Amino acid sequence: MTEISRQAYADMFGPTTGDRVRLADTELWIEVENDLTAYGEEVKFGGGKVIRDGMGQGQMRARACVDLVITNALIVDHWGIVKADIGIKDGRIFAIGKAGNPDIQPNVTIPIGVGTEAIAGEGKIVTAGGVDTHIHWICPQQAEEALVSGVTTMIGGGTGPAAGTNATTCTPGPWYIARMLQAADSLPVNIGFLGKGNGSNPDALREQIAAGAIGLKIHEDWGATPAAIDCALTVAEEMDIQVALHSDTLNESGFVEDTLAAIGDRTIHTFHTEGAGGGHAPDIITACAHPHILPSSTNPTLPYTVNTIDEHLDMLMVCHHLDPDIAEDVAFAESRIRRETIAAEDVLHDLGAFSLTSSDSQAMGRVGEVILRTWQVAHRMKVQRGPLAEETGDNDNQRVKRYIAKYTINPALTHGIAHEVGSVEAGKLADLVLWSPAFFGVKPATLIKGGMIVCAPMGDINASIPTPQPVHYRPMFGALGAARHHCRLTFLSQAAVENGIAQQLNLRSATAVVKGCRTVKKADMIHNSLQPNITVDAQTYEVRIDGEPITSEPADVLPMAQRYFLF
């Protein structure tokens, strides 16, 4: 067999087993763990290449071949870092393995035929589309901004730029839930809505789930009392939905211990568990130690930088309808912004004690920076703390798997949608993001939604080729016309499906049911299941694990920043 150099092979077919790839301009390096394509039998599209009739393309009809093949891609997911071909059929991932013509090639698991389109994955990284579980639906344009960052699923609540939505992620009541389901029907992302969980009458909560909400949000601005927490969780246990909690910063209705007592042993998703985004001051961060609490961060405190503290006060005053001329409002804001707990948050992510990242879109968070900021934290922690103890070899594979799980599979598990999205696995909706390694986590090369390209960088439309400047992201055919309804999902509760809500509202998009929300625990959070013994000093706010202080230094320079956004 003829041999070529490793560099020449990587240039032609992408990296293979043992090759290392740098992620953007970070200090994170991944190493290919396995290559499922066969040396000498690789498929590639183009003039004089392999995917031609009678060669890499077989004679089978459409029913026997995939609709789309992504060739020689480097998959980065919670389960591995693997080189493979990816086959997509009927909008879902058909297989991950070896593509080609089974009539003449061995071990083909992804048949290519006349009905197959090809996307060149050589030299590209493929990840699952991100899942952002903390969306304030203040404006519909957030969907586009999130999509071009690599997020394909958005869970949250709201009704537009109302005071309630500016502060809380709730879509309150059946009428608003119906209108928002109709409004979101043509947005190019998967969507699920959270109803308002602040109430002590279970029927007022049940009717929101029956109307189409996939969960309930309890927010202190509506009153996060122990009674409301208990009521929402009681309904959740009945109807298999998730509850998200923004707890009581002011400790008016109780302290963190009272909230934990109200929760009991029932699963709950605690938002911005560090506390700058809201929650019992100063020790809501201790909630991450409990087996039934699924802790997430929002991105304004990620990573901790020299500007983090100064930025937060004004953000908080605006988002929570506070008055800078009222001393009590200023004191409320200042109680939430603690340098010590923010400095500990990055470390808790690196240890796998915090399980999810999210945005808090336009309500103290940036909807287009969930992925970017997650990787900035990973970079900062490698620089400050060195390689993880679990690493083997000269790579950061275990750290990368930990961090990618925070915005893909773990939020999907938390909200009962992991059977549909959240990872690059056969059977799931083909929501995939292609990245050039130099732009990983910052600017995607191609966004695939339900098997179709939904958005991509595109050059001058009047040019003779697709690449001349100006190049910017444009919607593609997967985001247009009736096709968009086939390429996205609206998530509903089982009760809403049984009530025929999609038919009542004339929803055109495909729907999917959330399930398993009440059985998921911290131990199920992939690569992020640590339950540390954590304490916070009430006077100094110092955070300790098993008696040892944990902190990090603020960054004054970050990767994935200015050099990527000059134009």
UniProtKB/Swiss-Prot annotation:
Substrate binds at H219. Its EC number is 3.5.1.5. Residues 129-567 form the Urease domain. The keyword Cytoplasm applies. Its main location: cytoplasm. It is an enzyme of class 3 (hydrolase). InterPro entries: Amidohydro-rel, Metal-dep_hydrolase_composite, Metal_Hydrolase, Urease_alpha_N_dom, Urease_alpha_subunit, Urease_AS, Urease_asu, Urease_asu_c. GO terms for biological process: urea catabolic process. Coiled coil: none annotated. Its cofactor is Ni cation. It catalyses: urea + 2 H2O + H(+) = hydrogencarbonate + 2 NH4(+). Binds 2 nickel ions per subunit. The modification N6-carboxylysine is found at K217. The active site is at H320 (proton donor). One of its GO terms (molecular function) is urease activity. Ni(2+) 2 binds at K217, H246, H272. Heterotrimer of UreA (gamma), UreB (beta) and UreC (alpha) subunits. Three heterotrimers associate to form the active enzyme. HAMAP family: Urease_alpha. Belongs to the metallo-dependent hydrolases superfamily. Urease alpha subunit family. This is Urease subunit alpha.
